[in-house]
């Protein structure tokens, strides 16, 4: 999934969010609908960031013609949770440049944004994420990242030194 060239234009958008976005949800629905078919992936009875991240990421894993957008208070919890799913490459973006670079270099397939950001900024970030194409850059690095997913990592050991 990560090796596909091109942009996310025309793909299905799986959208997950938590309670922080609920008051302005209609505005986000409208903004996202300008870019394609939006499928809300939330548990309407429990607007919890982990539940939304799980629903969006499992949908993106099984639907190669899609990508995800996750929005919570800061975007950090969603990005941490999303990156635990095999084949998901989530990026928390706080600027248009972040969105462009995570697509151009890392071919991210899930965008994480902060509900606490200015709406106009988030709209610009979303547009950049969707319209920026992955062109095949840094392929060796992406292959290495993909190998991390299946690796059995040894536990980290802390080394304490006294002065």
What is each of the regions a protein language model found here?
Residues 70-91:
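Compact, glycine-rich, soluble single-domain proteins
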Residues 16, 40-42, 68-72:
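Short, conserved beta-strand edge motifs with alternating hydrophobic and charged residues
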Residues 12-13, 64-68, 87-89:
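Short active-site oxyanion
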Residues 24-36:
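A short, Lys/Arg-enriched amphipathic alpha-helix followed by its capping loop at the start of a domain
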Residues 2-8, 12-27, 96-163:
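C-terminal binding/interaction regions
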Residues 36-49:
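A short beta-strand-loop structural module common to alpha/beta enzyme folds
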Residues 52-74:
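Short, structured active-site "lid" loops
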């Amino acid at each position: 999934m990560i090796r596909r060239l091109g942009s996310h234009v025309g793909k299905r958008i799986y959208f997950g969010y938590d309670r922080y976005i609920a008051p302005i949800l209609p505005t986000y629905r409208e903004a996202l609908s300008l870019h394609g078919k939006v499928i809300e992936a939330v548990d309407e009875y429990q607007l919890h960031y982990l539940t939304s991240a799980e629903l969006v990421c499992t949908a993106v894993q099984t639907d190669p013609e899609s990508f995800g957008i996750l929005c919570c208070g800061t975007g950090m919890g969603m990005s941490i949770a999303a990156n635990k799913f095999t084949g998901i490459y989530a990026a928390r973006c706080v600027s248009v440049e972040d969105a462009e670079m995570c697509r151009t270099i890392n071919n991210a397939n899930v965008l994480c944004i902060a509900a606490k950001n200015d709406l106009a900024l988030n709209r610009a970030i979303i547009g950049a994420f969707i319209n920026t194409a992955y062109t095949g850059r840094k392929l060796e690095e992406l292959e290495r990242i993909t190998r991390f997913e299946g690796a059995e990592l040894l536990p980290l050991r802390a080394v304490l030194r006294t002065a």
